[in-house]
């Protein structure tokens, strides 16, 4: 099906272009979302009449998105989840969780604007892409931890596995010292 794009669509084209897409993609996504019109004579004429208005509207939303992007870019948000000792989450962190974390911090971000390559299933710092406008994309960091204290440690650069290894090494050292003291005490008797 041929459609006229009313806004820039990633991997498809710019506003005003007539592109060929699969019927289902047009019917189920582009047309209902208002991102495109069917490419027939009457729609092409009406688009040409509205083109200046649509470009002005697109420029305005891009400016608003750029203003939000300036504040949002590089921000870090803490997401508290329960996890195993090895750092594997019970469940996963999804786009909804990322959007809620950003909203709680005072940013207006919808879950459809968050782009995850795959769901986050382990503790640590994860970089996530936020598409505020088709032409305005920023990166944020999600700090996934079991507690606020753990999140602060991760933010300072220490991983959970490193901390567990340090604690285990310290415990082994204390046990070795204890045996040395017991051995020294038994030799004195």
From Swiss-Prot:
Pfam assignment, any one: Ribosomal_L9_N
PROSITE patterns: RIBOSOMAL_L9
Swiss-Prot/TrEMBL keywords: Ribonucleoprotein, Ribosomal protein, RNA-binding, rRNA-binding
GO CC terms of this entry: ribonucleoprotein complex; ribosome
One annotated GO molecular function: rRNA binding
BP-aspect Gene Ontology terms: translation
HAMAP family: Ribosomal_bL9
Free-text function comment from the UniProt entry: Binds to the 23S rRNA.
Similarity section: Belongs to the bacterial ribosomal protein bL9 family.
Protein name: Large ribosomal subunit protein bL9
Native source species: Cereibacter sphaeroides (strain ATCC 17023 / DSM 158 / JCM 6121 / CCUG 31486 / LMG 2827 / NBRC 12203 / NCIMB 8253 / ATH 2.4.1.)
Lineage, opening ranks: Bacteria, Pseudomonadati, Pseudomonadota, Alphaproteobacteria, Rhodobacterales
């Amino acid at each position: 099906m041929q459609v006229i794009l009313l806004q820039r669509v990633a991997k498809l084209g710019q506003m005003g272009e007539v592109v060929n897409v699969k019927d289902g993609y047009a019917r189920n996504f582009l047309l209902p979302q208002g991102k495109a019109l069917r490419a027939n004579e009457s729609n092409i004429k009406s688009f040409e009449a509205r083109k200046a208005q649509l470009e002005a509207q697109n420029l305005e939303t891009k400016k608003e998105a750029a203003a939000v992007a300036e504040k949002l870019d590089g921000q870090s948000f803490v997401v508290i989840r329960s996890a195993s000792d090895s750092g594997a989450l019970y469940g996963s962190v999804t786009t909804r969780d990322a959007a809620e974390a950003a909203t709680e911090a005072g940013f207006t971000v919808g879950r459809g604007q968050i782009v995850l390559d795959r769901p986050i299933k382990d503790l640590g710092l994860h970089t996530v892409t936020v598409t505020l406008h088709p032409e305005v994309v920023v990166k944020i960091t999600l700090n996934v931890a079991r507690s606020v204290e753990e999140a602060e440690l991760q933010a300072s650069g220490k991983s959970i596995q490193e901390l567990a290894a340090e604690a285990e090494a310290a415990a082994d050292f204390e046990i070795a010292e204890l045996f040395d003291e017991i051995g020294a005490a038994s030799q004195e008797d």
